[in-house]
Amino acid sequence: MASLNPSAKELHLLYVLTDSNLPTGGFVSSSGLESFAKHGFLSSQYSYTPKEFKDGVLGKKNMTGGLVDFARAEVSNYASTTGGFVMDGWTCVNDSRKASKAGNGIIEDEVQRVLQKIQALDKYHECTLLSHVGRRSSKAQGVAMLTLFSRGLSRPVGIDEYLNEDGGGPGSTDELGVKIVEGYKKMVILEKAPGHLAVCWGVITAALGLPVDRALHLHLFLHARSLLSSAVRLNIIGPYASSQLLLHPYRDIINQEVEKLSNCTTGIIEDKAEKCGEEEDLWAWTEDAEKGPATTWPLGEVLMGRHDIQHSRIFNS
């Protein structure tokens, strides 16, 4: 859990990760916004949400209001489908780092054990994404994040005399964390793991020492910001309107979803040892299903799946 008063190192790491110049691959994806707009839902004369009823008549909406409605539905769906994977990916690496610092086990053995969990988590994420468009976008951004860690977030070579780091705290990467990320990247290159963004983000933020709640919040913030960047590139709104939306209505949307993710999990990396000896419950699978990822906006998934049939398009999703 993050401190209410983050350290200077943690703040600096957050500033680095929120830099819009970082090559994260997010510019290739509109998260379904392009297809949503092309199918006429965003530019419809009347609002499509029940909340806009006035005296039994749907009220007119402007483009910025449509983007807020879109973000409310899309960010909620994104949080529900990816939050558990960020949490579990982060937990795998963080628990391993704690065990390593306590002197438990050999690093190479620990790395392989964690990589097996990450591989299973990543393959499960592949199964939960409903369209080939969503999978393609997630993998492209995941690979970009792994590359960013290796080339842009690792310690620079040859300037140790200029660094004043004690090897701990947010932003520092220990040997185990680096080996896990590099091992995961190798699995993705060898096509032994898909390399989805949510899993990559959880693994990388844990390796950097970022608290999990900040990792989840930043995960949704960057996603919401990319929606607005896509809207600007699609000429739906201008850059000033984008900043207004991100500062005001999107803040509440993000905070609401972050609160829901406080105990999120996929349920597939839990330690089952404590359940041994207990009588098997016929309906135990329903509890696991409730914990796992879920699609909350089917319309958005359908429209994203139709992205490739557009006659012209800017983004790959």
Curated annotation (Swiss-Prot):
Entries under InterPro entries matching the protein: UreF, UreF_sf
GO MF, one example: nickel cation binding
Protein task: Urease accessory protein required for the maturation and activation of urease via the functional incorporation of the urease nickel metallocenter. Plays a role in host brain invasion.
Matches recorded under Pfam families: UreF
Chaperone in keyword set: yes
Family indicated by similarity: Belongs to the UreF family.
Keyword Transmembrane helix belongs to the record: no
Keywords: Chaperone, Nickel insertion, Virulence
Gene name of the record: URE6
Deletion consequences: Fails to grow on agar media with urea as the sole nitrogen source. Leads to the inactivation of the URE1 urease and reduces the efficacy of brain invasion in mice.
Name of the molecule in the record: Urease accessory protein 6
Higher taxonomy: Eukaryota, Fungi, Dikarya, Basidiomycota, Agaricomycotina
Quaternary structure, from the entry: URE4, URE6 and URE7 may form a complex that acts as a GTP-hydrolysis-dependent molecular chaperone, activating the urease apoprotein URE1.
Organism, scientific name: Cryptococcus neoformans var. grubii serotype A (strain H99 / ATCC 208821 / CBS 10515 / FGSC 9487) (Filobasidiella neoformans var. grubii)
